[in-house]
Amino acid sequence: MLVLLLVIATMITMMDHTPYKQMAYYKEWKSLVGKVEKDTVTATDFKVGWAKVNITPSSPVPMAGYGNRRGRAYETVHDSVYVRAIVIDNGHTQAAIVSADLLIIPPTVSKVLQAKLTAKEIPFDQVFFGSTHTHHSIGGWGTGISGLFFSGKYDPKSVERIADAIFQAIVKAKSDMEPARLAYLESKDTLDIRNRLVGEEGGVDSEVRSVGFITETGKKAILSSYGAHSTIIQSRNMVLSRDYPGVLVDSLESGRNDFAMYMAGAVGSMGPIERGSDDFDEMKNQAFGVQQAVLSSDTILQSPKPSMQMITLPLPLREPSPRLTMDIVLRPWVFKKAFGEYPLFVKALRIGNILMVGMPCDFSGELVGGLDAYAKTKGLDLIVTSFNGGYIGYITHDKYFDRDLYETKVMSWYGPYNGAYFQEVIRDIINKLS
C-alpha cells in the first residue's frame, strides 16, 4: 500500500496558479512574435485554384468522436468525407488553405505533413489547416490514451492516407490556378447557435464569416466559417458523415458556387440548435440557417492585387496539467506519456484586409467578440478557426475555469489564464500583420 501511494504521489500534483505574465513561456512568446515583420512587398498578380480529394474508406474503420462512436467502426456511409484545398498566389507569396472532414487535423498527420510538404510544392509553414469538426468521421489517428478516448486503435495507414490526401489536394489545386478577385463576406446567424457551456449566462459568436473568390472566367469558390459545433448527429447513430457542414457545402456548390469549403470557427462552448424530426432533418435545418446567412452577407471587395502573408509560430505554454479534481492534476510527464508530445503552433494568414488565425484547440466563441472588434480598428476582418494541426483541448473564458464542467475540467489540459493568454496572442498577431 505504501509503495502504491508513493507511485501515485509521483504522478500527481496541485494546480499551478502562477499568473501567465510571470511565466517563462509568456516571455518566450513575446520574443517570438516580436521578430515577426510585416511583409510589405507589392503583389504583382492574384491567382487561385481549388481541389478536393475523397477520403471515404472502402470499408468501415473506427470513428473519431465521443459516446458510442469512440473507437467503434461506422456501420454505413451517410455521406462521403473529403479533404479540400484552396491555393492562393499573389506573385510574391503562395499559401494553401486546407480543411478536412475530420474531428481535428490530427497532430500525427501534421507530423507526416511536415516532412511531405516541402518548398517544391508548398511548405508546411505556408499551409493554413482547419477541419469541419464532424464527430462522425475517420479515426485511427490518435496515439496512446487519446486513441482510447477519441479515435480508436491507432492505425499508421490511416494517418498516411489522410496526409497523402491533403498533399494531393494541394498539388491538384496548385496545378489549376486562374487570375481571380477576392471578397470578404460577413453576416449573423443568431438562430442556429447557443452557449452549451453555461447557457444564457454566456455569450455566443453568431457571425458567419466567409472568403469569396471569383476567377476571370467566372468560376466561384467560397470558404465559410461558423462557431456552432458539428454535433447534430447523435452518438448512437453509427454513420460516416460530415454532419451539417456537409449539407452546407453541398448546398453552396449546387447554388452560386463551383466550389465550397467549411472550417470550424471558434467552436469552444458553442453548440448548434437542433430542430427537426430526426438527426438528418436537424442537419438540413442547421445548414439552411447558416446558408441563408452566407447568401445574405455584406460583401467587401478586396484589392485586385492583395498583399499576402502567412506565418506559423511556435506557441509556448505552461506544462500540461490535466485535472483529476478541480485542484489535483496529473504531472506533465504522465500526460506526455499518455497522450504523446507534439509541436504546438499558431498559424495566421493575411490576404488583403482579411486575417485568418488558426488555433490548436477548441477555441471559445466567447473570446472572439472583443478580438473581432479590435481587428476592425486595425482595418482587418478577422476569422478565428480551431484545429490548426496541433491540439491542446479547450480554451474557454477564464471566468469559468473553476467550474466543474466538461470543457473546463475534462478537456482543460494546460492550466489557468489561457483565455487571456490566447486572446493576447491573437492581438499580438493582429498588431504585427495590420
Model features per residue range: what roles?
Residues 297-299:
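Accessory structured domains or lobes within enzymes
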Residues 290-293:
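Anionic-ligand-binding alpha/beta catalytic cores of soluble enzymes and soluble regulatory domains
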